[in-house]
Amino acid sequence: MTMTDPIADMLTRIRNAQSVYHKQVEIPASKLKRELVDILKREGYINDFEYIDDNKQGILRIELKYSDNDEQVISGLKRISKPGLRVYAKKDEIPRVLGGLGIAVVSTSSGLLTDREARDQGIGGEILCYIW
């Protein structure tokens, strides 16, 4: 069976693993997912990730992050642009998530960027998801 929205599947796997306090979660890999997970690591939402080559498409093993008193670092993940309804924003229309406390992941001509990076570079694109 084919997957219609691999990004939504990845976000759901992370959300489900965090809700039951798993230390790590494995998801099928792709270039886009790798870039998205790299943003999560750079922004401090996950500890680390590694790519495992299984001679097929590969697997991304994501090490989830919790605070000292076992609270989830990621409190919310929301898919914005979906296969049935794409959402685009110009450079001056890129949204702020929770007044700047969260991030919006934007797919641009320069690759995946956070909302801040896209605003700084002055480029718009497709709003993939919100993370807070």
Curated annotation (Swiss-Prot):
GO molecular function: rRNA binding; structural constituent of ribosome
InterPro entries reported for this sequence: Ribosomal_uS8, Ribosomal_uS8_CS, Ribosomal_uS8_sf
GO BP, one annotated term: translation
Alphabetical UniProt keywords: Ribonucleoprotein, Ribosomal protein, RNA-binding, rRNA-binding
One Pfam match: Ribosomal_S8
Coiled coil (UniProt feature): none
GO cellular component: ribonucleoprotein complex; ribosome
Keyword RNA-binding appears in the UniProt entry: yes
Source superkingdom: Bacteria
Classification via NCBIfam families: PRK00136.1
Function: One of the primary rRNA binding proteins, it binds directly to 16S rRNA central domain where it helps coordinate assembly of the platform of the 30S subunit.
Quaternary structure (record): Part of the 30S ribosomal subunit. Contacts proteins S5 and S12.
Family, as annotated: Belongs to the universal ribosomal protein uS8 family.
The protein's name: Small ribosomal subunit protein uS8
Name of the gene: rpsH
